[in-house]
Curated annotation (Swiss-Prot):
Gene: aadA
TM regions (residue ranges): none
Function statement: Mediates bacterial resistance to the antibiotics streptomycin and spectinomycin.
GO molecular function per UniProt: adenylyltransferase activity; aminoglycoside 3''-adenylyltransferase activity; ATP binding
Superkingdom of this protein's organism: Bacteria
Descriptive protein name: Aminoglycoside (3'') (9) adenylyltransferase
Length: 263
């Protein structure tokens, strides 16, 4: 199954890795494919997720050239018949090994940055609490396209740090403007955070949605069901029309997560 999914995007993957190697050799230590491609299967709007590890920081010329070239290998979900959205996260080895929280991210590229990139705006290196979650994902499920396996290269992220990152993420969503236009992703991400808070593991979005469905009061189940079906391409996404129900869902699930990870 995993090999078939990777084969489905092999041409695009080769192009992306080629761009990374061209700009980052000889400082390149590893490239890991993680996310839906290797855990649960690519869905209609799934990204291709790559974690790249290098030995030194990027100079500004390299950063800009790499990002501009990555832009040519990626497309926003639904905009291309042959290209998927690509998300590339780059870390410097000594910033994350040995592990400490919060860790520093050297670079991140994704379709949400496209307009900024085209306008000449490039995100600098920054502290990123999400690296605790990302590295946990990579250690649990990934394929090394370059370099050693993730579980050999990276230290385990302590559960306390994972919980802290999950808890920090919850602060992003407090009122409807915080999820406007991104309703499906927020519903599914909250389900994954809830799953991770309870189990200490990370699951694909649809698996976490099924898990959450079994634990939700009946009045919130239509929200997660619609998000799941839209994610799988089985139903149109109409979550924006469920404004009151959606807000109640968000606050309920945040409350359940907080019971587990604390405040």
């Amino acid at each position: 199954m995993r090999e078939a999914v990777i084969a489905e995007v092999s041409t695009q993957l080769s192009e992306v890795v080629g761009v990374i190697e061209r700009h980052l050799e000889p400082t390149l230590l590893a490239v890991h494919l993680y996310g839906s491609a290797v855990d649960g299967g690519l869905k209609p709007h799934s990204d291709i997720d790559l974690l790249v590890t290098v030995t030194v920081r990027l100079d500004e010329t390299t950063r800009r050239a790499l990002i501009n070239d990555l832009l040519e290998t990626s497309a926003s979900p639904g905009e291309s018949e042959i290209l998927r959205a690509v998300e590339v996260t780059i870390v410097v080895h000594d910033d994350i090994i040995p592990w400490r929280y919060p860790a520093k991210r050297e670079l991140q590229f994704g379709e949400w940055q496209r307009n900024d990139i085209l306008a000449g705006i490039f995100e600098p290196a920054t502290i990123d609490i999400d690296l605790a979650i990302l590295l946990t994902k990579a250690r649990e499920h990934s394929v090394a396209l370059v370099g050693p396996a993730a579980e050999e290269l990276f230290d385990p992220v302590p559960e306390q740090d994972l919980f802290e990152a999950l808890n920090e993420t919850l602060t992003l969503w407090n009122s409807p403007p915080d999820w406007a236009g991104d309703e499906r992703n927020v519903v599914l991400t909250l389900s994954r955070i809830w799953y991770s808070a309870v189990t200490g593991k990370i699951a694909p979005k649809d698996v976490a949605a099924d898990w959450a469905m079994e634990r939700l009061p009946a009045q919130y189940q239509p929200v997660i069901l619609e998000a799941r079906q839209a994610y799988l391409g089985q139903e149109e996404d109409r979550l924006a029309s469920r404004a009151d129900q959606l807000e109640e869902f968000v606050h309920y699930v945040k409350g359940e997560i907080t019971k587990v990870v604390g405040k």
